[in-house]
A protein has these predicted regions:
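Conserved single-residue anchors adjacent to enzymatic active/cofactor-binding motifs
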Residues: 1-171
Length: 171
């Protein structure tokens, strides 16, 4: 719950915290690549005011991959087929580079027909400023701050006879 409370507080607020059950890792065979794929973290929870349970799938990603959204969709489809429950997919990107914002959707379509649009929640640590989490008592914040970035502010002041200039550069 600490992870959700830190990064997805609105969603965390809808979960009954007494209902969280972590499930065993799921293994799938990728018949195209001939590899075994593992769903890293899967939890079953109840949402406040509902009797039915949902699944939360958290997939850590330590390297940038263009096919990651597609892979996460495949995991989603297989989990949905097996469990027949609503699934809240979350990716946590812990890579240092690239610094560009990661893609958080996978689409299949044609110019006049959108067949599929799969979206997922994403926490991209290199897009977060560690200083924003410094005063949090959440242990997850302490553990992940090393992978976060620092937004650096440089103030340059040049004083010349007769006038002064100040410029601000954000890196």
């Amino acid at each position: 719950m600490e992870f959700l409370e830190l990064f997805l507080p609105e969603f965390a607020g809808t979960i009954d915290p007494t209902s969280v059950t972590f499930l065993q890792q799921e293994y799938f065979i990728d018949w195209v690549e001939g590899e075994e794929k593992i769903v890293d973290l899967l939890a079953e929870v109840k949402l406040a005011g509902e009797d039915a349970t949902i699944l939360i799938h958290l997939e850590p990603q330590s390297t940038s991959q263009t096919i990651f959204p597609q892979r996460l969709f495949f995991y989603f489809a297989r989990l949905h087929q097996k469990h027949l429950k609503r699934i809240y997919p979350i990716a946590i990107f812990s890579y240092d580079k690239p610094k560009k914002v990661a893609k958080t959707s996978y689409t299949v379509g044609f110019p006049h027909l959108k067949v599929l649009e799969f979206n997922f929640a994403a926490i991209q640590l290199n897009q977060l400023d560690w200083r924003d989490y410094l005063d949090r008592s959440n242990p997850v914040a302490a553990a992940l701050m090393a992978k976060m970035s620092a937004i650096r502010c440089h103030v340059k002041s040049g004083i010349q006879p007769g006038h002064s200039t100040t410029s601000l550069t954000v890196a």
